[in-house]
Amino acid sequence: MWSEYSLEVVDAVARNGSFSAAAQELHRVPSAVSYTVRQLEEWLAVPLFERRHRDVELTAAGAWFLKEGRSVVKKMQITRQQCQQIANGWRGQLAIAVDNIVRPERTRQMIVDFYRHFDDVELLVFQEVFNGVWDALSDGRVELAIGATRAIPVGGRYAFRDMGMLSWSCVVASHHPLALMDGPFSDDTLRNWPSLVREDTSRTLPKRITWLLDNQKRVVVPDWESSATCISAGLCIGMVPTHFAKPWLNEGKWVALELENPFPDSACCLTWQQNDMSPALTWLLEYLGDSETLNKEWLREPEETPATGD
């Protein structure tokens, strides 16, 4: 049976061209080197070296063995390292859920920063809507969720970090009929136009809808890009996160409506599986920061940088 040491011996003999030179490099006696090679040849049932009067040279089988053996040893070393990492809590993947209500640019930056720190761990990020976040967590598909509602629909052992409140804005395109009318608007007035809806991604838990009045038509969209297109086209009323609406409101393309029944802010949280920590998850929890940082970076509209004079 061959070992990492026997491969090292064969490699030394092949490079030096003799058993004695290889023995000198390995700090062994020539007979020990010769014995190791002979035992390996008997196990393989093929000669590894062509023995000449003054030197030795690898046979075709010997050259193949050396090439393949190096590859096997490299894999063995990687396997050994991974076993040690796993014993210390390392896992090759970290799966997280991100609620669609958070600022998308923050998710993108988090991914970049994660891979700068972990080049041997895959970060799997799943975009979920409403109860889809809790569904992914309760099913064990993810280990952490960002932007989950604090109205917890499932039982289980979860740790939490408050993210504060998310504010909503009811918006329409600046050319929409409601934009030309004075508020505050009643539900009876609003239900004459369709409501923008993001479909809940939950597989097993009850599905939720952000804002939909009785007998109101829906415009169902798959993502925020489609949401912006539909709102800008004047197809619907949109109840959207204020941080999402801000650029269009600032440019005058959308108008925020005043409602007789204002939509309340949503309480959000960061939550993760308790007693299932890994180095990557520990790092991510520290990276995400405290409650104030989470609210500022993930739920609020970006702060405008004041202009500076020369």
Curated annotation (Swiss-Prot):
NCBIfam families: PRK11074.1. Pfam families: HTH_1, LysR_substrate. It is found in: Cytoplasm. Residues 19-38 bind DNA. Belongs to the LysR transcriptional regulatory family. Transcriptional regulator that activates the expression of punC, which encodes a purine nucleoside transporter. In the presence of adenine, it binds to a conserved 23-bp palindromic motif in the intergenic region between punR and punC. One of its GO terms (biological process) is regulation of DNA-templated transcription. Coiled coil: none annotated. Keywords: Activator, Cytoplasm, DNA-binding, Transcription, Transcription regulation. Its main location: cytoplasm. Disulfide bonds: none annotated. Residues 2-59 form the HTH lysR-type domain. GO terms for molecular function: DNA-binding transcription factor activity; transcription cis-regulatory region binding. PROSITE patterns: HTH_LYSR. The gene is punR. Disruption phenotype: The deletion of the gene leads to a substantially decreased growth rate in minimal medium with adenosine, inosine or guanosine as the nitrogen source. This is HTH-type transcriptional regulator PunR.
